[in-house]
Amino acid sequence: MDRLKQSLLDAPIIEKDGYHYFVHPISDGVPMLEPELLREIVIRIIRKAELDEVDKIVTPAAMGIHISTAVSLMTDIPIVVIRKREYGLPGEVALSQETGYSENEMYINDVHEGDRVLVLDDVLSTGGTLRAITDALEQTGADVADVLAVIKKAGPNELDDTDMDVRTLINVDVADGEVVVVDDQGDH
């Protein structure tokens, strides 16, 4: 059994406002992230993602940063971190991020018209974050070459009604207080 699948099966579940969450090193930073798990995930991302002529990896703060950094080190593709803080730099693009539990403003810098980007995130759950990011990138004139989330949580999400395909490494659900693997190969 692969490390990602086993780590999800072992993940504790918490409830917040009626929503069930798994607590996992990729999505939460706890428990600690073992290098073997990160290495496995990075290798699978590199094999699965459309990286041809990608200029930049675009990732939201905070939980996409460690994954994107490791992918960047292996591919020599630079990273753009979408921040929750406004810097006021020329070309900065604001976006509204809505998730199952919060709403925030986020800001993209260093992505320009014609840039070919990979959007990389930890979890696809409600789709609010990835939808806001891809919409904002399209407004800048960037070419979204691919969108990849390590883990997809079952259920409807905001990308279902779009033509945006999201690749995932593993698809899970939370049922009866535990993680259930729906598809250990993910989407695409």
Swiss-Prot record:
Pfam families recorded: Pribosyltran
EC class (word): transferase
Superkingdom of origin organism: Archaea
Disulfide bridge partners, by residue number: none
GO terms under biological process: purine ribonucleoside salvage
InterPro entries from the UniProt entry: HGPRTase-like, PRibTrfase_dom, PRTase-like, Pur/Pyrimidine_PRTase
PANTHER family the UniProt entry points to: HYPOXANTHINE/GUANINE PHOSPHORIBOSYLTRANSFERASE (PTHR43864), XANTHINE PHOSPHORIBOSYLTRANSFERASE (PTHR43864:SF1)
Entry protein name: HGPRTase-like protein
Naturally occurring in which organism (per UniProt): Halobacterium salinarum (strain ATCC 700922 / JCM 11081 / NRC-1)
